[in-house]
Design a protein with these regions (language model features):
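Short amphipathic alpha-helix that is part of the acyltransferase structural core
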Residues: 1-32, 123, 133-140
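A conserved beta-strand-loop-helix scaffold within acyl/acetyltransferase catalytic domains
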Residues: 29-73
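Conserved acetyl-CoA pyrophosphate-binding loop and the N-cap/start of the following alpha-helix
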Residues: 78, 82-87
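Conserved GNAT acetyl-CoA-binding A-motif
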Residues: 93-106
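Conserved catalytic-core motifs of GNAT/GCN5-like acyltransferases
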Residues: 101-103, 113, 118-136
Length: 140
């Protein structure tokens, strides 16, 4: 399967980004909010198969030594084919000089561990949607 990666937001349908996030069970907002988030990110990756968006991800960074990965999603029927790995490798390559953190969806930790991510012992967060994050298994 041939996958093409796009490393910018040109001609991206952010309503489709919302639909993919819904399909994979991740949090989502309206298209304009996601457009703002991706356009203001340090690194973005959109994966396409035959001109159809099948996945994406992004990272925010200070560009010096810290970065955080967000919104890694692959359409369910394309999961398990290396698409997520391609997206993550593209992001990691551009941030190789940085410490990189992320929130893994519960159950997806092994995927990130294969990419050399390790669980944090002291990670903490303040969430706008605290109850939702707790019920989804992100917080104690």
């Amino acid at each position: 399967m041939e996958v093409t990666l796009q490393l910018n937001c040109s001609n991206i349908d952010f309503n489709n980004v919302c639909e993919i996030l819904k399909r994979v069970g991740m949090g989502y907002f309206d298209g304009e909010v996601h457009k703002k988030a991706f356009e203001n990110s340090h690194s973005v990756v959109f994966a396409f198969h035959e001109e159809q968006m099948i996945g994406f991800g992004r990272a925010i960074s200070d560009g010096a030594y810290e970065a955080a990965v967000y919104d890694i999603a692959v359409v369910p029927e394309y999961q398990g084919n290396g698409v997520g790995k391609l997206i993550m490798e593209s992001i990691i390559q551009r941030l190789s000089h940085c410490n990189i953190i992320l929130f893994a969806s519960p159950g997806k930790e092994p995927f990130y561990q294969k990419l050399n991510f390790r669980k944090l012992k002291t990670g903490m967060a303040i969430f706008v949607r605290e109850e939702q994050m707790h019920s989804a298994g992100f917080t104690e």
